[in-house]
Amino acid sequence: MKNYSIRPYQESDYELWNTFVSAAKNATFLFHRDFMEYHKERFEDFSLLVFDKVKLVAVLPANRVGDKVYSHQGLTYGGLVYSSKLKIEKIETILDLVFDFFKSKRIEHFYLHPIPSFYLGQGNAAIDFFLMKKGAQLYRKEMNMVAQLHQEIPISKSKLKHFRRTELLGLRVVEETNFQPFWEKILEPRLVEKYAAKPVHSLTEIQLLHERFPQNIKQFSAYLEDKIVAGITIFEFENGVKSQYGATSKKGEKYRALDFLFISLLDIFQKRGKLFFDMGIVNDSGEKGFHSGLLQQKEELGCTVWNQDFYKIKLV
């Protein structure tokens, strides 16, 4: 490790960090500083940069809470991001360096949930192997429901039948840059009504993120007679897309507008050459550990289960 060095991220690293993330083989736009920092007041940043002599070879998006470090509590996933040219064996060397740095800062536990493997055409299994070798504990799994777009999508016959019926009603799918109709007329009121909850992102935040990442954050809405009845907020990546939010009005439920929108988007992104459609997790806090209704809905939309893994490692 004599040629390697490590230090915390600082504001002057903004361009260096973003350029590296853009070229890395295991990163998405969620690791761009403009995304990570839209809510920076909520987290104590503890991101790290690793150098081989003067060349940046890895970064770790992370936040600190007392004697614990997370990668990352403000993101859907985190993990060690490394150069596409980095040899696999060097990943272990870099992990050792990161853990030694943590110990020097009196960090006792490190929590990590790596980017799911289906996001990465080249895979990301090496980090899992080395984490387990270092004594990490796989303490949690979440079921990600994912449709594979590079093959025929096994949408259920009943979903397709209702799709064709709804299509005859004249529902229109619209991609729009204004998130307000969906947020204020559909998403926020339905979350309050059904779960007494709010979306993770406020309208102001999602609009800001869309302005920062117009090619990645998109809003698709279903309209019937010029009234919005459903919406899906999409995060778009190089290889695929994720439905970050999806909801429908009571009127939309009657016409199965959300399913109509999902099937329409599956077709749209399949034709655009995307490889996967991530419809999110179905875990909940109930006895089963998952939401049966959501699982069935997404399975009938052609999804299968891909795991999201969560690791923790005791450092001292």
What feature does the model see in each segment?
Residues 1-11, 306, 314-316:
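Short, Lys/Arg-enriched, disordered terminal segments
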Residues 4-53, 60-68, 116-142, 146-252:
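A conserved beta-strand-loop-helix scaffold within acyl/acetyltransferase catalytic domains
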Residues 40, 69-72, 287-290:
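Short glycine-biased active-site loop of nucleotidyltransferases that positions the nucleotide triphosphate
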Residues 43-45, 104-107, 217, 271-274:
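Short, high-confidence coil segments that cap the C-terminus of an alpha-helix
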Residues 60-62, 81-83, 92-99, 216-316:
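Aromatic (often tryptophan-rich) hydrophobic motifs at membrane interfaces
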Residues 73-77, 140, 306:
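Short, solvent-exposed loop/turn segments at the edges of secondary structure
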Residues 75-121:
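A gly/proline- and charged-residue-enriched helix-loop-helix capping module
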Residues 112, 141, 176, 279, ...:
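Residue-level detector of family-conserved "landmark" positions at structurally sensitive sites
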